[in-house]
Amino acid sequence: MLNPITKKFQLGKHTVTLETGAIARQASAAVMASMDDTCVLVSVVGKKEAKPGQDFFPLTVNYQERAYAAGKIPGSFFKREGRPSEEETLIARLIDRPIRPLFPEGFTNEVQVIITVVSVNPEIAPDIISLIGTSAALAISGLPFSGPVGAARVGYTDGQYILNPLQSELPTSQLDLVVSGTDSAVLMVESEADVLSEEVMLGAVVYGHEQMQVAVSAIKEFKAEVNTPSWDWVAPVKNAELLAKIAELSEAQVNEAYQITEKAVRYEKIKEIRSSVLEALLAENADVDVQEAKDLFHDLEKTVVRGRITDGNPRIDGRDPESIRALDVMTGVLPRTHGSAVFTRGETQALVTATLGTQRDAQRLDTLMGDKTDPFMLHYNFPPYCVGETGFVGSPKRREIGHGRLAKRGMLAVMPSLEEFPYAVRVVSEITESNGSSSMASVCGTSLALMDAGVPIKASVAGIAMGLVKEGEKFVVLSDILGDEDHLGDMDFKVAGTTGGITALQMDIKIEGITQEIMQIALNQAKAARTHILSVMDEAIGGHRDDISEFAPRIHTMKVSQDKIRDIIGKGGATIRQLTEETGTTIEIEDDGTVKIAATSGEQAEDAINRIKALTAEIEVGTLYTGKVVRIVDFGAFVNVLPGKDGLVHISQISEERVNNVSEVLTEGQEVKVKVLEVDRQGRVRLSIKEAMEKPAAEATPAAE
C-alpha cells in the first residue's frame, strides 16, 4: 500500500506540490514536484561508501525532458529521446551550481541527481520547479546536505518586479533572472537583462531571495514530516601535525612562488616545491600518505594566496584589487571571414569570428515549450592548448555550452531586430589562451567581431569577472580575476554590459554570508572595470562598419502581393528552383509576401529582383507588349507577354487583311508586338496584333525573359 507524504504551498501565482513515497521508492530519495501542470520527478541516489583514494566530490546532475510531457512524439528517426539538448545541459548546470557548495568539504561519496520532466504547461518553464524538487529530494535523502535551497525567476516590467513570470510575459520583460539560495544567503544568479542599472539588478536578486523563502520553509517542514535518518558520515579530521610540517618546509617558498606573474612559470615553480616537500616528508617517514600530503599542500596554497590578499598585499600578478590586466584589441584579423577580432586581457585571449547567413541558416529548435527559430548563435570552444595541456578534442562539454550561453545572454540586448538586419548571425569564440574569465573575453570579442562584420549592434558590450576573498569580517572584492583567484576564492561574479547598464549577470558563491553590501561593491567595481574596457574597445573600433564584408551574402527585401506567392514558387517549386539556379541567389518567401533575396553580387540580386517583378507583374489593358508566339491554333495564336502569362490573339486580330490560315502569317517562337484589349474576370487575356500595328510610334513594353 502506497502512503505518499505531500506538501503544498503557494509560490507567487503558482501552487507548488511536493510528494514522496509513491514513486521511485528504491532511490535514496525521490520527489514528484509540480508547479501547477508542470511536473518533474527528481531522484537522488548516494553511495554509502566512497571510492578509496578519491579526492573530489563526484556529484552528477542529469536533467532530461521527455517529449510525452508536452504530448509530443520525438521527431528523430528513432522516435525516442537522444543525447541531451543544449537547453537540457544548461538547466542541469543551473541545478548543479547552487547545490554543490552545500555538501561538506571532504565528502567524496558518489551522488547522482536525475530530474525527469514528465508533464509541462507551455506557460511554466520546468527549471524553477526542477531546482525546488532537487532541493527537496536532497533534504529528505539523509545525505550531509546543508540545504535546503529555494529558487525563483524574476522579471521586470514597467518598473515592477514580477515573481515567476509566465513564458508569454517574458518577451515584454526587461529582465529574466533566476536566483537560488538558502534562508540566509544567495548562492547562484543567472540572468539576462535589457541594459538595466546596477540598482535594479541588485534589487531583483534581493527580491527573488526574499520571495523564495516560502519554498525554503516548506521544504524544511517537508523534511521534518518525512524524517529520514541522517547518514552517520563524519568529516575526515585534517592532520594538523602534517600540515604544520608542510608549512614549515614550504610556506615561505609558496609565498614567493605566488608572486610570479607568468602562469606557466608559477605552476612549474609550485610543482617543484610540492615535489621537494613530498620528498622531504617521505625521507623522514616512508609511511606518509602522499595523497593526504598533496591535499594539505593545496590547503597551504589557498591559505597563502588568501592571506596575501586580505592583508593588503599585491595580488598574484602584482595588481591591486581594482586593477584590470593589460588589454590588447585587434579587429579584421582574418581575411575571408565576415567579421573577426582578437581580444586579449593579460593571459586570457579569444579569437572571435562572426558569420552572416540568410534566415534559412537560423537554428530551428524543437523544444518542450514549442518550436522556435533562433537567428543568433554563439558558440564557445575551449581547446586544451589554451591552458598548455593535451586533451581530448570532440563535441562541446557542459562548461563550453554554459560559457557560450552566458556570452550570448550578454549580447542579446544589443542585437538588431530582423526588420533592421535580416541576417542569421553565428559567432564562434575560440579561446586561444586562458587564465581566468574567458567567457567575459568572449563577450568583448563578440562585440568587436560583430561590429567588424557590419552588424548594427545598439552599443558595444564588455564583460568582467569579479572575485571575493572573505575571512571573518574582512573581505576584498577583486576585479578581473585570474584562474587561481577564481579557484581559491569565495565568489565568481560575472557582469556584462554597455556604458548604459547591465545585459547579463552570473554569480556563483561558494560560502554563506555574502551580504547585500558585498554584492553592491562588486557591482560598482564591475561597472568601473567595464567602462575602462569599453573605452579601449571603442579606440579600436568605435562603431559597426558601414558595410558588410564583400564575402557575406547581401540580402535585398521586396514585397509582393500574397496572391502572387504561388507564381514565384511555381508548380512543385519549379519556378523558384529555376530562379535560384539561374541567378545564383537564395530566395526566401514569407507568408505575408516579403521576399528576401541573398546574393554575393549586386548583378545577381538585380537579375533576381527583375525576374520576380516580371513574374508578379499585372497585365494592363491598353498596354503594348513584345511577346513570343507559343502556340498556334485554328482560331488564332497564344502569345506569352509576361512570364507565366499568355494571351490569345484571335484570328480576326492578327491583321487588317483577312487571314484564312494562322500558320501562313505566324510561326511559333516569332516575336510580335501586341496590345492588351481585355482581361476578363477569370484572368483570360485578349490581345491584338492589328491594334498594336495601328500605333507604330508608340514604344512597346518588352516581355520579361
Curated annotation (Swiss-Prot):
EC numbers listed for it are 2.7.7.8
The record places domain KH at 553-612
Gene Ontology biological-process entries: mRNA catabolic process; RNA processing
Entry GO MF terms: 3'-5'-RNA exonuclease activity; magnesium ion binding; polyribonucleotide nucleotidyltransferase activity; RNA binding
Database matches in InterPro entries: ExoRNase_PH_dom1, ExoRNase_PH_dom2, ExoRNase_PH_dom2_sf, KH_dom, KH_dom_type_1, KH_dom_type_1_sf, NA-bd_OB-fold, PNPase
Q: Is DNA repair one of the keywords?
A: no
Keyword Nucleotidyltransferase in annotation:
yes
**Coiled coil: which residue ranges?**
none
Its recorded reaction(s) are: RNA(n+1) + phosphate = RNA(n) + a ribonucleoside 5'-diphosphate
* UniProt keywords, alphabetically: Cytoplasm, Magnesium, Metal-binding, Nucleotidyltransferase, RNA-binding, Transferase
Give all residue intervals belonging to the S1 motif domain. 622-690
Q: Give me the residues that bind Mg(2+), please.
A: D486, D492
Q: Which family does the similarity line name?
A: Belongs to the polyribonucleotide nucleotidyltransferase family.
Main function: Involved in mRNA degradation. Catalyzes the phosphorolysis of single-stranded polyribonucleotides processively in the 3'- to 5'-direction.
**Subunit architecture:** Component of the RNA degradosome, which is a multiprotein complex involved in RNA processing and mRNA degradation.
Protein name according to UniProt: Polyribonucleotide nucleotidyltransferase
Taxonomic lineage per UniProt? Bacteria, Pseudomonadati, Pseudomonadota, Gammaproteobacteria, Alteromonadales
- The gene coding this protein: pnp
